[in-house]
């Protein structure tokens, strides 16, 4: 991974041409330990295999490109323009891998059915996407949803974000943690676990609450999930396992329900830059809506004042959450996408089974 001014924990990995050999121990980052376990002899065993972009792109095989330029335009965000090359070299190999994993899981279900002598209810394959604010989780989720749904067997792919499982603002205000919105304690984790438990039990319909970024709160209505083949769950802290402060650690974790997990990784300085770009764009667009929770930052502040506020939000909320909760969970991901300053994925880490 990049070093120098790039502030993030370092990934220790095994090169693709030496996947079963030890790699030299690397210095620990001040943010978190390197991946793998350090044996007594000072070397490191890594659970991840590292791929350069070119190496990963070759794993596409003969997977056809099923997205048009118009399709792609509708999927990426204003801050993150994803090129067709990015889709072909990064996301097509990933969709191929996921398709193989889903097929293998379905075969395992058939074997179990044969053993039990009776068919079981179809259980969705759950893919989790984690990472920092402004890291590109939503764009990755939408692109994967579109690619997976276009496979020859046309699986049904649903997308749910954990924003809907935030406590309503009234609850956050009552508990005095409105300033901690996005931190683990601001989520109704029990409700999220119940939702995933129902999904994985094969329930016909499972309902999730709806969150509005315009009003910055939970709104009336429900998102109904009806037994998809694949469910993509996108959120900041989905890979975390620790309990919140003052609470007993849960016996069941959100990640217990995942079949595959992806972490979007980037330098903290780049993440901050992307966040401020997004803040500026929203100030010029959505924040101008009188119904917007952040309307005051579009009309009641100068540009300099608003951007200073954005930098303060990053430093006191988003960066703290990244260092304390989000980045430490990275090593639990099955696959890590390492982004450069221009949002291009430069390297990929895949956990060995």
Go through the PLM ranges and name each one.
Residues 129-145:
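Glycine-rich phosphate-binding P-loop
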Residues 126-132, 158-162, 261:
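Extended hydrophobic secondary-structure segments that form protein cores and membrane-embedded regions
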Residues 30, 46-126:
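Extreme N-terminal, non-catalytic leader segments
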Residues 109, 117, 121, 190-256, ...:
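Glycine-rich phosphate-binding loop used to anchor ATP phosphates in small-molecule kinases
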Residues 79-86, 158-160, 165-215:
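Conserved nucleotide-sensing/catalytic segment adjacent to the nucleotide-binding pocket
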Residues 146-158:
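Post-Walker A helix-loop "phosphate-sensing" segment adjacent to the P-loop in P-loop NTPases
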Residues 18-21, 29, 34-35, 40-62, ...:
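Conserved NTP phosphate-binding and transfer environment spanning the P-loop NTPase/kinase superfamily
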């Amino acid at each position: 991974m990049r070093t120098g001014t790039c502030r993030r924990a370092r990934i220790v990995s095994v090169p693709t041409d030496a996947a079963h050999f030890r790699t030299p121990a690397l210095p620990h980052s001040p943010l978190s330990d390197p991946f793998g376990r350090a044996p007594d002899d000072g070397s490191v065993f890594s659970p991840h295999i590292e791929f350069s972009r070119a190496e990963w792109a070759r794993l596409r095989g003969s997977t056809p490109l099923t997205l048009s330029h118009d399709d792609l335009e509708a999927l990426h965000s204003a801050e993150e323009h994803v090129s067709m090359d990015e889709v072909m070299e990064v996301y097509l190999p990933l969709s191929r891998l996921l398709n193989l994993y889903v097929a293998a899981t379905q075969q395992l279900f058939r074997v179990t059915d044969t053993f039990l002598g009776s068919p079981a209810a179809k259980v969705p394959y759950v893919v989790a996407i984690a990472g920092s604010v402004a890291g590109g989780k939503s764009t990755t989720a939408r692109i994967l949803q579109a690619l997976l749904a276009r496979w020859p067997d046309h699986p049904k792919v649903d997308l749910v974000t954990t924003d809907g499982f935030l406590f309503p603002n009234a609850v956050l205000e009552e508990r005095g943690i409105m300033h901690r919105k996005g931190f683990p304690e601001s989520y109704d984790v029990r409700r999220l676990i119940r939702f995933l438990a129902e999904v994985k039990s094969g329930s016909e319909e499972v309902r999730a609450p709806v969150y509005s970024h315009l009003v910055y709160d939970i709104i009336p209505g429900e998102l109904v999930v009806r037994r998809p083949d694949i469910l993509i769950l996108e959120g900041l802290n989905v890979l975390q396992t620790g309990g919140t402060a003052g609470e007993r650690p849960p016996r069941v974790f959100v990640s217990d329900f995942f079949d595959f997990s992806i972490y979007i990784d980037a330098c903290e300085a780049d993440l901050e830059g992307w966040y401020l770009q997004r803040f500026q764009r929203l100030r010029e667009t959505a924040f101008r809506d009188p119904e917007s929770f952040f309307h005051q930052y579009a009309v009641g502040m100068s540009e300099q004042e608003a951007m200073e506020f954005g930098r303060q939000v990053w430093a006191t909320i988003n960066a703290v959450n990244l260092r304390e909760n989000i980045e430490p969970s990275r090593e639990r991901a099955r696959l890590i996408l390492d982004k450069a300053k221009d949002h291009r994925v430069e390297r990929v880490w895949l956990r060995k089974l």
